[in-house]
């Protein structure tokens, strides 16, 4: 492995990257938050179903 070649490719990617605008950042946060809420709701739904079944938790 040639470390200089790998480092130069990493530097090239970092130079191309830019910071997101506020709208893009808030949209990413909103989508990530919605995903977290969805997974939590799904877990709660599974827990509720397992509790209602005979011999559940």
Swiss-Prot record:
SUPFAM superfamilies assigned to the protein according to its UniProt record, in alphabetical order: Preprotein translocase SecE subunit
Keywords: Cell membrane, Membrane, Protein transport, Translocation, Transmembrane, Transmembrane helix, Transport
Main localization (coarse): membrane
Molecular function via GO: protein transmembrane transporter activity
NCBIfam families tied to this protein: PRK09400.1-6, secE_euk_arch
Primary role: Essential subunit of the Sec protein translocation channel SecYEG. Clamps together the 2 halves of SecY. May contact the channel plug during translocation.
Protein name: Protein translocase subunit SecE
Source organism per UniProt: Haloquadratum walsbyi (strain DSM 16790 / HBSQ001)
Taxonomic path: Archaea, Methanobacteriati, Methanobacteriota, Stenosarchaea group, Halobacteria
């Amino acid at each position: 492995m040639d470390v200089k070649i790998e480092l130069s490719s990493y530097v090239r990617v970092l130079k191309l990257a830019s910071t997101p605008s506020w709208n893009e950042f808030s949209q990413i946060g909103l989508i990530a938050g919605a995903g977290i809420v969805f997974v939590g709701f799904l877990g709660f739904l599974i827990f509720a179903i397992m509790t209602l079944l005979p011999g559940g938790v």
